[in-house]
C-alpha cells in the first residue's frame, strides 16, 4: 500500500488499530513497528517538514523518490489527545466527542423535538465543553471495560 505513494501524488496514511468495539479483540501494530517494517522495504525516509497537510492528527514522512508522503495516525502509541480537534456525528445523529467513550449528545432528538438552531448550538457547545482530556487506550483492558467506554465498532460509529 505504501508503494502507491511512490507513483502517485497521494499521501498514504496508516491508522493504528483503535481498541474499541471489536478492535479490542485484535493486537494492533505500533507506529514504531510499522516504521521498522517499512524501513526494510522502502528507500530512506525522514519526517516531513513543510506546510501542514490537512488539519488532523496525522504526521507524515518524506520517502526518497516518492511523489506522495507516508503518514501515521497513531492514537495509541503516539497519543495526540491534547491536540485533538475531532468530533464525530454518527448516522443516528449522536455527537461523539471521543472515540473511546460512549458519551456525547443525541442531536437527532433535539432536532426531531423541534429544537431551534440556538438550542442545537447550545447542546453542541455543552458537549464540546465536556470533551474528555484524553483516552485510556494504553491503560489496560480493565480501564476499557466499564460502562463508559464505547461498545460499538468503528463501522457503526462511522469510521
Language-model features: locations:
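Short capping micro-motif at the N-terminus of alpha-helices
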Residues: 70-72, 97-98
